[in-house]
């Protein structure tokens, strides 16, 4: 560490790319690409951050405190990071070493923080064990005093003499001034930053910036004569009162402690490990390989414990690992050889028996004399304490001292440290739970303020009567046992102040027992004994130096009198009590508490900590779990208590397959198994409790209730006083008039509700079945089934019975046709708050419905089918459920992946009931769907001049483009991380050989693909061969068809449709298409070239029924169609779009030979021979759809034949000009005869403008009308006519009303229209847009009228109002209406133009 100054930050790599490549292959993700990008971002952040030695973070406890807001979903615990020298910087997830400034942003499951630290910065002086001022998290300021100051007290009476002793004051302690220390009477001892008072001999260390030497002197050594000569008694008292923590504690309590110091707290690894104790290390070798040539006793003596993997052992202190032991190996020699800096080894050198503080690396200055530290020697310690005691008093002292030793011996035995988790977790290792820090908050009983505490802070504040509350299995017992162990082991100086620590389980005592009897029975065992008199004397004499750890508290009434008095009258004894109590039992002891500690949910990193230790031999299993939970964030909270983790450990240990099945329901099953084992003697009581709690959970779930009161519990039959209930529910009473009850988590509530629903549906009692059906039928829409109740239904399926399953399957498969429910989508807000990830899922599903109702239907159908089949197979009722399944499949379109379901292996004939199966193949050729140029529309426009308050109505295209580019980049990065997988054909139907039934129709969607690779080709060959009919839809995928030639040639007789957009067909691909004999539909659009070879030979497709060609700006399409095309008499759809002039005569001939024509679209620029075209069309009696655009239209000619099309459903004349009134009137009259018309896009022109009101009236005769569009023709009178017609009830089926670009309508006309429009129950889209030159600035009354209008349109989901200049107040009105609208979650308002200019702001 060069000069302890700025550290140069070289580029470092935290990533193990070899392992990452393995992980990528395992999970099908390109993690390497993601890691490189993340590493670059991290490097940039490192360069910005401050480097150099950080003296403020040399305290491990302070480092630990920085992790309070740290993300819990990590692989490293804060304790591991703080012990390795790291603190949380607050910059993302970055942690930094206080010494070498190493900055890490990532975690690693395979490498601990200390290992990563050593690898990246082996030169770090903290890691090398040099004195850099590290303060262990359990370390204390009070130090063992030197026996003699050289020259005696007199030498240091003068402040300047004391100041001279600080010549070598360490660099890391410069935050505390030597002058301030010397002024307060202290002399530097030369050891670390330890100082000693020349007068009282009190010794202090661990000085940090901001420390006040006088305050420390007064707190720890208030009787010092020098202190009392310089400070008044009031000042000293104030110093003590203001001191944080250590109430009633002085330095004497630490100096005269009876606790043996096992190790100095300077290790950078596991400095509170239980393995400091040899017996506990020995216990870990019970599975040591018998064939190993090295005895485990020697390994234990050398500081090692067994990891459980191969013959790998790890040092509890330095963390070093050794393996591959051979005959003749000496563990101690190898330990010294490979890990010479190990603190444990250095300690062994210092002393063979009593383990003192490590000798300083630095030479001692003249201020002190070096003498052997013997203050912890038994005789000296006893003498210093007993010197003035009488004989009877000396007896209690000796017995108390003996008792302390017996207690320490008890607490360091394996039998004490093992968790008492009967049967279900008997294999859980000693260090697995004791090594975890629980998350704790402190609540002062008289203050509502809560604060998070680290474990060192808890230990510093132990005083008087305190409780630690938590749910069942939250770790209360572990926490108390950990305190007892740390005290006994000598690993925790913070606890040295206690001479006696009693851990007592209150569940195994009787009210008539004496305290001494309880202690003897529980803690001392055979041969151990202490009298009530001696115990009483010890407590009275030691007072604050006695700590009671009372576990399993259930109430004051059940306590023996002695313990009752210690709690209720603690002011008489002044002992310290920490009582572990379930959350719902706190109330009766709250009056006696000073502080209440509450254990929070078990952080996920603690789960990883336990599993990593428990399954160190199978770390891949733990990696899978972490990835599973990273993908399912809602489930991370299920490991909310150590007991849940212990349950899953047992499940994994007993059931290897469970390691690959990370279902939360499995965890809950394991937890319930634990309860059944724990309470197997009272199985009926447990079942009754689970049933009643399940009823409460079920009622709450369907009423969105996750908090309950006593009345709710009573109604469901839940007994809140039964202990079993506490394992399922928690009680909260703080700051509440009435207690509130919650289940252990929202998911656990759903689990219990699922258990109860299955119980009801499987019951023999009709009342129970009816109640179960009542709840099931409340899931009355597909969205509820796949969203709000998705998790619940999966839980139900895990319990499904043969009696319940067919009922559930039948109900689920009927939901897909509940159209009314689909149109009333709304999420359960309370549920979404508890399951935020479910909200994202809901948004996706809702967005899918908005964009593509067809895709939504297929998606929902597949999801419901999968769920139904889970029920059927889990309950072995496939035969009973098959009638419902087969009925569901009939005529449906699903994704190809459903064929992997087991059902299609068992029942391949069901495939024939489907309409079709879809498969999507997506590449990474990015294609923008939007043309940014805007030249066509905007090139002749001048930027509008508007007032500043209306500028928000326009967004510059550059800003929009920037956002769009960012979205594209996100998509690209996502695609790089998740490579496109091949269609999965590995299970179910695909394992049948031969395949008895074929896919009726296969729809293949290909997007943004280049040529297919060999793997995809092989998949397509198999899928095509299993299909009767194949339809292609290709977008931006040039070269794809040629690459799958082998597959097409094998199945060319099956291809019936080919739709191609934005791709170029090579000559070879055109020839390939011409070999498809069964082609019935051909669509070509938006290509840059004319596929002339294909078009010249269209007549070879003898079965062709549909031709759609949309090629704007390309050569005349009609001219390249062969004359023989007219022989295709089966043509049903002909759609031609070209912007060039065309020869009409050929088209006329074609139409004359297409008697079955249903759809005719034409866009081109010619006016000749229009009459012959109309005559030909008039002969097509089956026409359902007509669309004209471009200059290919003579109005009168078309109007004359219009009445012939009595079957017409869609008529689009948008943009066609009707100039004269006579023709327009005839057109209006003809409309009345088109009784089946569903969509009408009215032409424009002066003539139409004059008869607009007549057209509206004629529309009243069109009962099927769904879409109605008027552009450029409406005025105030005609637009109000639409409103009146609607209000009269004439447009009941209307879904889309488009009256945009009607600039003859004034503001008053709009206002009248809004005020009158009503009675459109199905209207979903209303368009009132104007162009930019026709922008309109309206008054508040008009906006208000629009708001009222919108509120009267209950189905409205889209409102277009571009060029309506709205200020902030106007938008507030609109948004308020939107919030209150029945479709508020779906209603979208378009009011902002995207333009290539900025508006001119008027002064």
Swiss-Prot record:
The keyword Nucleotide-binding applies. One of its GO terms (molecular function) is metal ion binding. SUPFAM superfamilies: Inhibitor of apoptosis (IAP) repeat, P-loop containing nucleoside triphosphate hydrolases, RNI-like. ATP binds at residues 473-478. The keyword Nucleotide-binding applies. GO terms for cellular component: IPAF inflammasome complex. Residues 464-759 form the NACHT domain. Gene3D superfamilies: Inhibitor Of Apoptosis Protein (2mihbC-IAP-1), Chain A, P-loop containing nucleotide triphosphate hydrolases, Ribonuclease Inhibitor. One of its GO terms (biological process) is inflammatory response. It comes from the Eukaryota. BIR repeats lie at residues 60-127, 159-227, 278-345. Keywords: Apoptosis, ATP-binding, Immunity, Inflammatory response, Innate immunity, Metal-binding, Nucleotide-binding, Repeat, Zinc. Zn(2+) binds at residues 315, 318, 335, 342. InterPro entries: BIR_rpt (IPR001370), LRR_dom_sf (IPR032675), NACHT_NTPase (IPR007111), Naip (IPR028789), Nlrc4-like_WHD (IPR053882), NLRC4_HD (IPR040535), P-loop_NTPase (IPR027417). PANTHER family: BACULOVIRAL IAP REPEAT-CONTAINING PROTEIN 1 (PTHR46914:SF1). Sensor component of the NLRC4 inflammasome that specifically recognizes and binds flagellin from pathogenic bacteria. Association of pathogenic bacteria proteins drives in turn drive assembly and activation of the NLRC4 inflammasome, promoting caspase-1 activation, cytokine production and macrophage pyroptosis. The NLRC4 inflammasome is activated as part of the innate immune response to a range of intracellular bacteria. The NLRC4 inflammasome senses Gram-negative bacteria such as L.pneumophila and P.aeruginosa, enteric pathogens S.typhimurium (Salmonella) and S.flexneri. Component of the NLRC4 inflammasome, at least composed of NLRC4, caspase-1 (CASP1) and some NAIP protein. This is Baculoviral IAP repeat-containing protein 1f. It comes from Mus musculus (Mouse).
């Amino acid at each position: 560490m060069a000069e302890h100054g700025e550290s140069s930050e070289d580029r470092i790599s935290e990533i193990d790319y070899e392992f990452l490549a393995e992980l990528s292959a395992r999970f099908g993700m390109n993690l390497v690409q993601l890691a490189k990008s993340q590493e670059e971002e991290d490097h940039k952040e490192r360069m910005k951050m401050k480097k150099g030695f950080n003296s403020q973070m040399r305290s491990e406890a302070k480092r630990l405190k920085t992790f309070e807001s740290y993300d819990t979903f990590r692989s490293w615990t804060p304790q591991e990071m703080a012990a390795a020298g790291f603190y949380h910087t607050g910059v993302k997830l970055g942690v930094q070493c206080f010494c070498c400034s190493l900055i890490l942003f990532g975690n690693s499951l395979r490498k601990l923080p200390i290992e990563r630290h050593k690898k990246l910065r082996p030169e770090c002086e903290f890691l090398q064990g040099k004195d850099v001022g590290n303060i262990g998290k359990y370390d204390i300021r009070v130090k063992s005093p030197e026996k003699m100051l050289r020259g005696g007290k007199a030498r240091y009476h003068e402040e300047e003499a004391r100041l001279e002793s600080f010549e070598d004051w360490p660099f890391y302690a410069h935050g505390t001034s030597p002058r301030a220390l010397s002024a307060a009477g202290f002399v530097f001892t030369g050891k670390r930053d330890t100082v000693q008072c020349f007068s009282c001999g009190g010794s202090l260390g661990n000085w940090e910036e901001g420390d006040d030497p006088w305050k420390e002197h007064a707190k720890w050594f208030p009787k010092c004569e020098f202190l009392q000569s310089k400070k008044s008694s009031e000042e000293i008292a104030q110093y003590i009162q203001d001191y944080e923590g250590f109430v009633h504690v002085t330095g004497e309590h630490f100096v005269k402690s009876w606790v043996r110091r096992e190790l100095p707290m300077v290790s950078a690894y596991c400095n509170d490990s239980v393995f400091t104790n040899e017996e506990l290390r020995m216990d870990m070798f019970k599975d040591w390989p018998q064939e190993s040539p090295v005895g485990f006793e020697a390994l234990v003596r050398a500081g090692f414990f067994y990891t459980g993997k191969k013959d790998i052992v790890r040092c509890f202190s330095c963390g070093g690992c050794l393996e591959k032991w051979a005959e003749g190996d000496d563990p101690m020699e190898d330990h010294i050889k490979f890990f010479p800096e190990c603190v444990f080894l250095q300690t062994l050198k210092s002393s063979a028996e009593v383990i003192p503080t490590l000798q300083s690396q630095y030479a001692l200055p003249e201020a002190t004399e070096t003498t052997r530290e013997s203050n912890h020697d038994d005789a000296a310690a006893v003498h210093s304490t007993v010197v003035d005691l009488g004989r009877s008093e000396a007896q209690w002292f000796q017995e108390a001292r003996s008792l302390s030793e017996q207690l320490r011996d008890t607490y360091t035995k394996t039998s004490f440290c093992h968790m008492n988790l009967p049967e279900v977790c008997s294999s859980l290792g000693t260090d697995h739970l004791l090594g975890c820090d629980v998350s704790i908050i402190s609540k002062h009983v008289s203050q509502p303020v809560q604060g998070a505490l680290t474990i060192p802070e808890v230990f510093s504040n132990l005083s008087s009567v305190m409780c630690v509350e938590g749910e069942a299995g939250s770790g209360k017992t572990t926490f108390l046992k950990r305190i007892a162990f740390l005290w006994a082991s000598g690993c925790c100086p913070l606890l040295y102040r206690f001479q006696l620590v009693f851990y007592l389980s209150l569940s195994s005592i009787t009210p008539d027992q004496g305290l001494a009897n309880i202690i003897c029975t529980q803690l001392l065992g055979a041969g151990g004994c202490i009298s009530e008199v001696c115990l009483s004397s010890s407590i009275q004499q030691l007072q604050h130096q006695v700590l009671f750890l009372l576990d399993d508290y259930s109430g004051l009434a059940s306590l023996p009198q002695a313990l009752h008095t210690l709690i209720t009258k603690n002011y008489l004894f002044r002992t310290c009590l920490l009582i572990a109590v379930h959350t719902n039992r706190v109330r009766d002891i709250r009056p006696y508490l000073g502080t209440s500690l509450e254990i929070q949910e078990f952080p996920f990193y603690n789960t990883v900590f336990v599993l990593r230790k428990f399954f160190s031999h199978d770390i891949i299993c733990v990696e899978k779990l972490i990835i599973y939970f990273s993908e399912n964030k809602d489930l991370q909270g299920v490991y909310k208590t150590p007991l849940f983790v212990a349950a899953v450990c047992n499940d994994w240990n007993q059931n290897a397959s469970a390691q690959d099945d990370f279902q939360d329901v499995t965890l809950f099953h394991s937890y319930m198994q634990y309860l059944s084992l724990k309470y197997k003697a009272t199985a009926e009581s447990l079942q009754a409790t689970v049933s009643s709690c399940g009823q409460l959970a079920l009622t709450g779930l369907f009423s969105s209730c996750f908090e309950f009161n006593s009345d709710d519990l009573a109604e469901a039959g839940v007994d809140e006083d039964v202990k079993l209930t506490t394992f399922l529910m928690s009680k909260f009473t703080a700051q509440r008039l009435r207690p509130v009850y919650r289940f252990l988590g929202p998911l656990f509530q759903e689990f219990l509700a699922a258990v109860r629903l299955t119980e009801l549906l499987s019951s023999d009692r009709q009342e129970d079945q009816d109640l179960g059906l009542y709840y099931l039928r409340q899931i009355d829409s597909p969205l509820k089934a796949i969203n709000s109740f998705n998790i619940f239904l999966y839980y139900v399926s895990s319990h499904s019975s043969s009696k319940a399953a067919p009922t559930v399957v039948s109900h689920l498969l009927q939901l897909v046709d509940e159209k009314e429910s689909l149109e009333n989508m709304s999420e359960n807000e309370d549920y979404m708050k508890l399951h935020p990830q479910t909200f994202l899922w809901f948004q996706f599903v809702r967005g899918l419905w908005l964009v593509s109702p067809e895709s939504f239907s297929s998606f929902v159908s597949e999801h419901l089918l999968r769920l139904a089949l889970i029920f059927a197979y889990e309950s072995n009722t496939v035969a009973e459920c098959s009638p419902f399944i087969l009925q569901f499949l009939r005529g449906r379109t699903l994704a190809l992946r459903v064929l992997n379901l087991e059902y299609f292996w068992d029942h391949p004939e069901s495939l024939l009931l489907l309409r079709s199966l879809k498969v999507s193949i997506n590449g990474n050729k990015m294609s923008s769907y939007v043309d940014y140029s805007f030249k066509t529309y905007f090139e002749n426009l001048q930027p509008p001049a508007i007032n500043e308050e209306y500028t928000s109505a326009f967004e510059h295209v550059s800003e929009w483009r920037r956002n769009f580019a960012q979205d594209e980049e996100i998509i690209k990065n996502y695609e790089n991380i998740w490579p496109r997988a091949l269609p999965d054909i590995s299970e179910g139907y695909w394992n049948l050989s031969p395949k008895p039934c074929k896919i009726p129709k296969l729809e293949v969607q290909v997007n943004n693909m280049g040529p297919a690779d060999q793997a995809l080709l092989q998949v397509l060959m198999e899928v095509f061969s299993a299909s009767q009919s194949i339809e292609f839809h290709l977008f931006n995928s040039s070269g794809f068809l040629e690459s799958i030639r082998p597959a097409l040639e094998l199945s060319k007789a099956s291809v019936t449709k080919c739709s191609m957009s934005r791709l170029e067909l090579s000559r070879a691909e055109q020839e390939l298409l011409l070999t498809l004999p069964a082609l019935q539909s051909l669509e070509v659009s938006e290509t840059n070239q004319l596929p002339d070879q294909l078009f010249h030979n269209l007549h070879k497709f003898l079965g062709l029924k549909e031709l759609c060609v949309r090629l704007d700006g390309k050569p005349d399409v009609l001219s390249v169609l062969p004359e023989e095309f007219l022989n295709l008499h089966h043509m049903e759809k002909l759609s031609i779009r070209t912007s060039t002039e065309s020869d009409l005569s050929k088209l006329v001939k074609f139409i004359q030979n297409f008697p079955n024509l249903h759809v005719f679209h034409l866009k081109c620029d010619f006016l000749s021979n229009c009459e012959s075209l109309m005559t030909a069309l008039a002969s097509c009696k089956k026409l359902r759809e007509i669309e004209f655009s471009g200059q290919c239209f003579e109005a009168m000619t078309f109007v004359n034949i219009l009445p012939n099309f009595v079957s017409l459903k869609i008529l689009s004349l948008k943009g066609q000009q009707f100039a004269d009134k006579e023709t327009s009137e005839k057109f209006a009259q003809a409309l009345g005869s088109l009784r089946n018309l569903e969509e009408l896009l009215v032409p424009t022109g002066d003539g139409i403008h004059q008869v607009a009101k007549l057209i509206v009236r004629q529309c009243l005769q069109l009962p099927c009308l769904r879409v109605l569009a008027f552009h450029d023709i409406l005025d105030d009178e005609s637009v109000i006519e639409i409103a009146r017609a609607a209000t009269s009830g004439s447009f009941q089926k209307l879904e889309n009303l488009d009256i945009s670009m009607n600039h003859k309508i004034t503001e008053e006309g709009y206002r009248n229209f809004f005020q009158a429009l009503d009675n459109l129950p199905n209207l979903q889209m209303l368009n009132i847009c104007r162009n930019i030159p026709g922008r309109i600035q309206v008054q508040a009354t008009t906006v208000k009228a629009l708001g009222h209008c919108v509120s009267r349109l209950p189905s409205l989901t889209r409102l277009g109002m571009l060029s309506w200049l709205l200020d902030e107040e106007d938008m507030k009105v609109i948004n308020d209406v939107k919030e209150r609208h029945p479709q508020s979650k779906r209603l979208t308002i378009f009011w902002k133009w995207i333009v290539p200019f900025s508006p001119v702001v008027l002064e």
